[in-house]
Structure formats: structure tokens, C-alpha cells
Design a protein with these regions (language model features):
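Carboxylate-rich, polar loop motifs that coordinate divalent cations or form catalytic acidic clusters
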Residues: 1-251
Length: 251
């Protein structure tokens, strides 16, 4: 069975509490399909999932970037054979971006559909290349953002810019064209090439952040490691109650 790691478990829990349950229960018999790990490359850890064009699904897996076309599973390793931590299926670039450990790049199809890997991190300087775990890859306005353990790399028109953060970055998300990062010092946003604390979220400055999710009414839902969920609209931050706070803290 595909094993979703702790970072991803927060997203699964939130998904379950925000979707309309009636629809789920109505189609429960076909909602979950189980695939044994022997089918998809025996990598027991899967970190992210990215669908593409209603035909393929891509997985950031311990053994590499995994592709599933509805019938066949194919594993594509990175150059350094590290775990793949993140995956982004870009319909604008027609590429599958993947991030591992101190490496990121993209897979692009040849005329016959075969995916070929192109390493991008090899173009960085030695110091900038020490990204650690690449937990997030995002794109907005033709800019690619690659989130490592303590820095973000921006890529535009063949040029790279590295923005370091004086904190451990645990997660990131692109919301309405703005890159949010969750750290062990609260939530920050990237403006140009500078990180700024998220306005209205000062109360979370000492919290470790595990997830940042757009809210349908504007603002973001912030997932903390130990204190549950919060809603921030850029002015104030309040607890976001689901009724499952105790369960999330224990799990």
C-alpha cells in the first residue's frame, strides 16, 4: 500500500473534514483503490502526489519519481538516486518537476512519449546547491520556486536567485501568486527576494508550521505541529475549529 508520510497526513485529515461527506459516502465502494508496493517500485514512502491532464498521476516516492498512467507504474530515479520529496506537474511547461535531496530537475517527454530527466540543480553554485530536502516546488508568473530546508531558489529566464531563510523551512505553498513558507518560527511570505512575517500571524511566531492551505473565503488555513489549525486573513489569526483537534494532536 502507498504510505503517506506525516507531512502529508495533515493534508489528508483536512481534506476529510472540508469535503462534502455525503458525496464520499455515496460513492464509498469506489473511493479507494489499494495498490501493493510491489506494483509501483517497492518504495514504501510517498511524499506528494500530482495529477496531470486527467491521464497520468505522478508520485514523489522513496525510490524516485513514479508515474502511473492508469495501468502501468514506472519509476524514474534522480541523478543522485535520492528519495524524491516533491513533484509538480506543470501543464504550462509540459514538464514534471521533481525535487530530491540536494537535487531538483524536470522530466520532459520525447516525441515518442518517453520521459527524459534534466537536472537543474547542477547549474547552481556549490553553496546554493546545498538545499537539503526539496519539500516543495511551485510555479507562478513563469517563475519556478524550489523550497529546500533553509532556502528558496527562484528560476526565471535561465537565471537563478537563492533566498536564504534564518529558520528551518518545513513546508510551503503558492496561494494567489504569493509564496508562503511554514517554519519553526511561524509563517512567512516571499516578496521579491525577501522573506517577511505574515501579517496578522504574530501569535504563531513560536509555532512550528506543517501546512498552509488556501481558504475559499480568502486568507489561509495554517496547520501547526502541536496546536491545531488557525485561520489568518492577513489582519488577525483565530483558531480554525473542526472538532478533530485532539485526534490531530495525538496522530
Amino acid at each position: 500500500m502507498i504510505r503517506i508520510q506525516p507531512y502529508s497526513s495533515y493534508w489528508v485529515l483536512i481534506f476529510l473534514f472540508l469535503i462534502p461527506f455525503g458525496k464520499v459516502f455515496a460513492g464509498w465502494n469506489s473511493f479507494i483503490v489499494n495498490f501493493d508496493k510491489s506494483l509501483y517500485g517497492k518504495g514504501t514512502q510517498t511524499w506528494q502526489i500530482a495529477p496531470y491532464d486527467d491521464h497520468w498521476v505522478y508520485f514523489a516516492n522513496k525510490n524516485g519519481m513514479v508515474q502511473f498512467d492508469g495501468n502501468v507504474w514506472t519509476v524514474f530515479p534522480m541523478n543522485n538516486f535520492s528519495d524524491v520529496r516533491s513533484v509538480l506537474a506543470s501543464t504550462t511547461q509540459k514538464r514534471i518537476y521533481a525535487g530530491g535531496i540536494n537535487e531538483f530537475g524536470y522530466y520532459e517527454p520525447l516525441d515518442d512519449g518517453e520521459l527524459v530527466y534534466h537536472c537543474m540543480s547542477d547549474s547552481l553554485g556549490d553553496a546554493s546547491r546545498l538545499l537539503g530536502n526539496v519539500w516543495g516546488i511551485h510555479e507562478a508568473d513563469n517563475i519556478l520556486y524550489v523550497q529546500g530546508d533553509d532556502r528558496v531558489v527562484k528560476y526565471l529566464n535561465g537565471k537563478y536567485a537563492t533566498i536564504e531563510m534564518d529558520a528551518k523551512i518545513d513546508c510551503s505553498n503558492m496561494v494567489n501568486g504569493i509564496l508562503y513558507i511554514g517554519t519553526d518560527r511561524g509563517v512567512w511570505v516571499l516578496v521579491g527576494n525577501t522573506f517577511f512575517p505574515l501579517q496578522g500571524a504574530d501569535s504563531l511566531a513560536s509555532n512550528r508550521i506543517r501546512g498552509i492551505i488556501p481558504h475559499k473565503g480568502g486568507g489561509v488555513i495554517i496547520v501547526t505541529a502541536y496546536d491545531g489549525l488557525f485561520y489568518c486573513n492577513g489582519r488577525t489569526t483565530v483558531p480554525f475549529t473542526t472538532g478533530a483537534e485532539d485526534f490531530m494532536r495525538e496522530n
